[in-house]
């Protein structure tokens, strides 16, 4: 690419999901509804866990952090996406774009590791119930959660610092609904081989480590479940694990598709639709999947609602 076609940029233009005028209202209402449910479910779950002593256990400690990350995850992307649906000026400043990517990457990597930690927590709870509270001590819970946030922050700093070194772009139009790294790299004039290689390697390493932890945990859980004599208890355990694995599969599957392909620079329409699942849909589904059929959560919610009504 000739230097005459390259320039520094003060802002980027986000094309969004679709430029079809007839779809604007439908898309706006759909994503507004999803965002509303996401806020209500995740903030509600976090608040319920804090106020209910019944839920002061390791599994809900991790779930409260997952809900917090999902709330942040969604809030980083969806409000700007909703505003751009009707805005003629779909601009975002260069700094705003970099900040959005940094926060998005931090939350994304943190969530991936949190899901692995939660799978390990389920393994300890089901396979070693008598030692569960001793094994998953307050100290270990804090250390594991801190490690998740640390990994997210480090990965984000690596990618963001390298992205900030790109000075010239051949265009400022991003074919996406938020500032993600692959479409940004596709616009760069300079050599971004290091960026693309690191993105591929870091994403692949994170996915490999966390998927290995998750699969190992659930295989051991499955082995334990098969030894349960009660058909009802076995069915309950299977259904719970199946719902958890569904959420994990969708989340990890889309991440593998988007980021674990060498030189996946151009963000086409298929990539954007795939990205919607783990940036918009999964943050809404996670609190529902992890608590919908949970008796402890339902009892705690009824108790809190009952006390509010009678107060």
Swiss-Prot record:
**Gene3D superfamilies from the xrefs?**
Rhodopsin 7-helix transmembrane proteins
Q: What PROSITE patterns does its record include? A: G_PROTEIN_RECEP_F1_1 (PS00237), G_PROTEIN_RECEP_F1_2 (PS50262)
What are the annotated GO cellular component locations? Answer: plasma membrane
Q: Signal sequence span per UniProt? A: none
Query: A biological process (GO) annotation for this entry?
Result: sensory perception of smell
Task: Please report which protein family the annotation says this sequence is part of.
Answer: Belongs to the G-protein coupled receptor 1 family.
Listed name of the protein? Olfactory receptor 5L2
Species for this entry: Homo sapiens (Human)
